Amino acid sequence: MKTKTFLAAFLAALMLSAGGAVAQEECPRGTLDERYCDRDGDLLADTPTDPAELVDPDTLIFAYTPVEDPAVYKEAWSDFLDYMEEVTGKDVVFFPVQSNAAQIEAMRSGRLHIAGFNTGSNPLAVNCAGFNPFTIMASLDGNFGYEMEIITYPGSGIETVEDIRGGVLAFTSPTSNSGFKAPSAILASEFDMVAGRDFEAVFSGKHDNSILGVANKDYPAAAIANSVLSRMISREVIQADDVVSIYKSQTFPTTGFGTAYNLVPELRANIEKAFFTFEWEGTSLQREFEKSNEGQFLEMTYKEFWDVIRKIDAANGVSYACE
């Protein structure tokens, strides 16, 4: 009897194990973290099929990528978030974040539901935190994106990129596309210049820190996003002639907006509706972002729009593993 009982238990365990292996095989995920699946091949974490894994919070938390003073953007987003409250029937709270890493961790841990992640952080947010981006800001004629520029100050003695050799170049943070990853790849491929060998790299933390650092002559040169530079000049934080551009890249997609992967589908649909039906005219959002010629939310797919960014990451040996 004991032998039969043991055998039955063994066979049951074997079947469960086999079932688990099949389930594992039926959950393709590419570079996504092991907690996510990507059965439709869009490179994004799928919505959970188990209702118990879906969330429908009473209060939605929104965070915008950590550039410049968070207080500025709390005000800038206020009219939009009021509209989102109307559309979703939920309270919506602006959550100021101080770093890309903190923003990603907040979404991974379930404390952040809607976000705008900067260009370089999007792939890590997608793969590690289950971020599902679906829109970016664009101009009214449908153009979108920004360029990475390397800037210096007048009279610095730096007139070309090669003049940075033997000197210092300020980056923003390791997760930033225009503030680190793109310039690193471009410097290596176009100029045979590598940080630590040909110049000293320092990190300022944010684009506005780098821009102010150059304008105040604390940094001889910096790699920055020109969309941030344009807004700072428009707000007269610096004057246009405080800095000089010595390099301008191809156009990259700008901040990607989206939701956590596990919100209930009806809520996610209403959040998307809020983005695509928001009337910009006369709002706090328009007042801030018209400075960089943005005036609408444009539908996009991460798989297509972030292809160039993933290629830059691959060239830099970037891993999307959660740390």
Which role fits each region the language model picked out?
Residues 1-8:
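Bacterial N-terminal signal peptides that target proteins for export
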Residues 8-17:
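Bacterial N-terminal signal peptides
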Residues 21-102, 286-323:
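N-terminal hydrophobic or amphipathic helices and topogenic motifs
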Residues 62-85, 119-120, 124, 143-212, ...:
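Bilobed "Venus flytrap"/periplasmic-binding protein-like clamshell domains
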Residues 65, 140-152, 237-275, 279, ...:
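Periplasmic-binding protein-like
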Residues 85-96, 190-204, 239-242, 320-323:
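A local structural motif
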Residues 101-115, 128, 162-163, 207-227:
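Short helices/loops that flank or line small-molecule/ion binding pockets
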Residues 125-137, 232-246:
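Ligand-binding "clamshell"
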